[in-house]
Amino acid sequence: MLVGLIAIVLIPNLGDAKFRIPLTSVRVPVLLGGSRFNMTNDPRMPNRISNITFLVAFLSSLVLISESPREVGGVLMADGFSRIFSTMFLGALLLVSVATTHRIPAKTKAPIPEDSDSKATVDRKISVLIDNRRQVDFYILLIMVGLGMSMMTMATNLFMMIVCIELASLSTYVLVAFHKESPSGGEAGAKYFIVGSVASAIGIYGMSLLYLWSGSLDLDVLRESWQAMDGVDPFAAFGIGMMLVAFGFKVSAAPFHLAAPDAYSGAASPISGLLATASKAMGFVALFRVLVIITVPEGAEALWMVALGIFAVVTMTWGNLAALTSENPKRMLAYSSVAHAGYMLAAVAVVGSGISSTEESVVILTAVTFHLAVLVLFKLGAFLVITHLETEGKGHNIEHLHGLGNRDPMIAGSMFLFVLSLAGVPPLSGFLSKLLMINGIVSTSASTGSSDTSDIATWAESVDPLFWLAAAIVLNSALSLFYYLRIGLVMFFEEPASTKPLKAAPSLRMAIFACAILTLLCGVGPVSEWLLDLVNGAIDSFMHQV
């Protein structure tokens, strides 16, 4: 991706400039500046470079996913765990880059405004020129997000991890507010930046406490210090707690999620989808590294287990209740994303319970990672459908989905598939990932109940409270059906305001249909088995560090 970043800066600036050697008449071509070449001066060039960069990086990461671990510079480790998440991030960024072809379109030979033009024509021409001008800026930021996320997955040092997270986060703050001509975009970006900056500051302060306590920020050293600790050191406890606040913001866990709905609804839909999938997965990688590697004691309950379990239930319930009353589809999907964070936090809480064996922990973490992987398909796919509506200036109200089944049955069918998968309806990939998480929680906790199965009340009183986390996931998934099915209802049973078909947008449609097909294939069959095997191998690699 570093090559792609250099290419996207240099190629659009290639021209016929020459440098004259002093005291001679010899002119040497320098290729940068002067009159730009027609081919490289095309405003669509940055998008093409971005698409190629992410495609090559994604395929390379996929091919290398099973390679042996390799240490880089003493603070980075390329292993199965880092590669599976890098592949996930690059896949999401590739979809976003392809979708943005039509969300921020570039037009060749765009006309300039003239005195005889009407105000509407002038505004339209200026909008086209602005979109052309900011192509390079947008895709540079997108590649910077990819660089930060990919390096973050390999970090074995807490300082390196925070630096990489901030590299990705600062770029996403700008991307949220990228449409500065939109009042909602600027407001969303400001809120997201302020809350994110405060969360980052708290996390960095927590990191400094951990350094004060242990004298090192290497994850292995921190783990050894934690295991050797007698009792609970205040510096260590407060340090981990502050890190949890920072990462809680990244995964949109309540009550640190308050800026997320505004950011998702104000940003362009492809960026909202990126925040709901890749950015969330980045937060969970950090949680895995800090909670599981450093703080899970052998055969004992982790310090954070009860708090994380409570946060999980509050997060999933808050997200689903808020989504029920949302009229903005992007805001609804944002609260849905909060609920999904709660489901995954519940599973992570079980790993720190002290009653989970290594094998059961592998099953649970595999389920969470698999859910993060398939979330890229159906959550980002749903945002891409909203992107299609945004190309018409719509998508910010659920009324804009009315009659979509009549206007474009294929797009409406894909959207319905995505929301069913978000709800966890079989045989889709969202059902399989939720089933694996619930199965992991139940298999760990159910055996702690009374052996007298004839008395359900006695068993319910004696079973470990972790069991009720699985029950909370089931109940909240049932609750979520109300707002997910509402989307299907308005698409197929309401009359559209216009019967005009959606714009062609071929690359955007291709991305939507790819997500829909993979949502089906990853739910059952050989593709889901292949993906589960990859994820399981990655988690095995991760658990060897514990």
Listing of model-derived features with the role each one plays in the protein:
Residues M1-V546:
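Alpha-helical transmembrane segments of multi-pass membrane proteins predominantly involved
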